[in-house]
Amino acid sequence: MIRILVSNDDGVNAPGIKALTEALAEIATVMTVAPDRNCSGASNSLTLTNPLRINRLDNGYISVHGTPTDCVHLAIRELCDGEPDMVVSGINAGANMGDDTLYSGTVAAAMEGRFLGFPAVAISLNGKALKHYHSAAVYARRIVQGLLAHPIASDQILNINVPDLPLDEIKGIRVTRLGARHKAEGIVRTQDPAGREIFWLGPPGVEQDASEGTDFHAIAHGYVSITPLTVDLTAYRQLSVLQDWVDKI
């Protein structure tokens, strides 16, 4: 039987991870290990200065007082009964497109799975007042089945974004590149009840590159977006340019 490790960054009680676990349980043995709270924006952070405490829940899930990356690392290295065949992260409440991927704990959980040597997928549902986790779960299951049957290169994860639409209104799947956003909106400056100064980070910037071929464009036109991501951040096309620059200094 196929074994799949499921995690997320919205927390172990989020509706997305429940929908994902139930959908994947139809094709695999699923182990669900996720943060005990919302860790959105945690990126690839690890907890190195405190112990990781876990709680085994009545529904079989395991919550971890740690980040999404902690969850996947701990699950694979210690908690899983045998290695998983795949790591699937999500379903995130909100898209992870363009620059979002740099900050996303959802994407980071998948990246950690790939870093440890396993095929990995991150899946997110675009929108705010989300209604259609079932649509995202169905596409997640379909894509996971395809990935198991036809593996991709070992240095990649698949970043999937699904429009918040009924299943029969989604037009299909498009392979995309990452788009881009304008810089984030301003900081909100205010005071807490005790009169102390506090700050809230503003919402993400609007789309800057949402042209055809991007994840933003696919979602806006009712398609599921799949973008292959690599862990290697090296800007290979700039190596020779940088070498020329170094030779001049």
Curated annotation (Swiss-Prot):
Entries under SUPFAM superfamilies matching the protein: SurE-like
Binding site for a divalent metal cation: 9-10, 40, 92
Catalytic activity: a ribonucleoside 5'-phosphate + H2O = a ribonucleoside + phosphate
Entry keywords, A to Z: Cytoplasm, Hydrolase, Metal-binding, Nucleotide-binding
Cofactor, free-text remark: Binds 1 divalent metal cation per subunit.
InterPro entries documented for this protein: SurE, SurE-like_Pase/nucleotidase, SurE-like_sf
Protein localization: Cytoplasm
Keyword Metal-binding: yes
EC number: 3.1.3.5
Xref: Gene3D superfamilies: Survival protein SurE-like phosphatase/nucleotidase
Any GO MF annotation of the entry: exopolyphosphatase activity
Gene Ontology CC entries for this record: cytoplasm
Role noted for this protein: Nucleotidase that shows phosphatase activity on nucleoside 5'-monophosphates.
Family: Belongs to the SurE nucleotidase family.
PANTHER family associated with the record: 5'-NUCLEOTIDASE SURE, 5'_3'-NUCLEOTIDASE SURE
The name this protein goes by in its record: 5'-nucleotidase SurE
Organism: Shewanella sp. (strain MR-4)
Lineage start: Bacteria, Pseudomonadati, Pseudomonadota, Gammaproteobacteria, Alteromonadales
